[in-house]
Amino acid sequence: MPSRRWFITLSSATAFSGLFVPSSGRADLVNRNARIMVGFPAGSSPDFVTRLLAEYVKDYAPSIIVDNRPGAGGRLPLDALKGGERDGSLMVLTPGDQVALFPHVYAKLGYDALRDFAPVSTVCMVQFLFVVGPVVPPEVKTVTDFITWCRANPKLASYGSPGEGTRPHFMGVSLARSAGVEMTHVPYKGGPPIVQDLLAGQIAAGVVVVSNVLPHVQAGRVRALATTAPQRASILPDVPTAREAGYPALEGVEWFGLFVPAGTPPEIVAGLNSAVRKALDMDAFKTRLAEQSFEPKGCTPAEFAQLIKSDLEMWAATVKAFGFRPMD
């Protein structure tokens, strides 16, 4: 896949004064309960990060509710955020693909990230693992071994992704093209079903978020052949990077970020950004992210907007190069 700047240069958070201070002495940014929508079910990686963030920015509002709205590839909360309340009480935490990739793979997407949303901050960076299940014999220990096995077993050569037109889908396409091998793509609705079918021997391989498969890798039920990040995962130090394995086509990470509706007052956006950045400075917050192989990463709203623009351009070129036809 085309290379890009994976990590964000941090700058100091914008200060915010003029907080709403209720009689209890709490310094809440908004004087009503807030809601963070997430487009994936409970137990998913975005859900984990959303709930963790809600716990650590609890002084932002009297209470913060996590609203799971799974389905449609994670797009439902973004559809609901468009034109939503602009008082800081409505937010969405989403992976970057729903914002920067989906405009190029869906013909009738109901939102425009640069027009309809106000970016607040990234929260973390997410890496994937290229893993194989028990259908692949134990002597397959590297990506090169897997490619050789695919050539010898074309009917079994398959990989799962969280859905058609997702980043892991394109990672698999990139790997197959660079290696000159055919692999059947099997789309799923998220990472956990991929792992279930890997364990059951229904598919040979998968590209999944580390946290979805980590317990099974550690238990030896599935084997991780490469991580997609530029550096090895600290929690799996023996797993090589895709580049180390000789297949940079598999390289790539994704951000999770927080948004509010376009038109939300700048002082509220700045205050929420400050609350997120404060959480990202807490050792306990960083430790809990690291335990699931998420890398804490914040930025200013302006930096986040620029990242989205860069990703939109990168994915436009990538999707075009793959000849992918936009879906309805």
Model-predicted regions and their roles:
Residues W6-R26:
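N-terminal export signals
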Residues R26-L114, L156, E164, V181-V207, ...:
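N-terminal (or domain-start) structured segment
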Residues N31-N33, R177, V181, P266-D328:
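An extracytoplasmic/periplasmic, membrane-proximal ligand-sensing/linker region
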Residues G83-S89, H104-P193, W255-R288:
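Hinge/capping helix and adjacent helix->loop/strand transition within the periplasmic-binding protein
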Residues D97-K108, S174-S178, A205-V239:
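A ligand-binding cleft/hinge motif common to bilobed small-molecule-binding domains
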Residues M125, T142, V213-D281, S310-E313, ...:
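C-terminal lobe and pocket-closing loops
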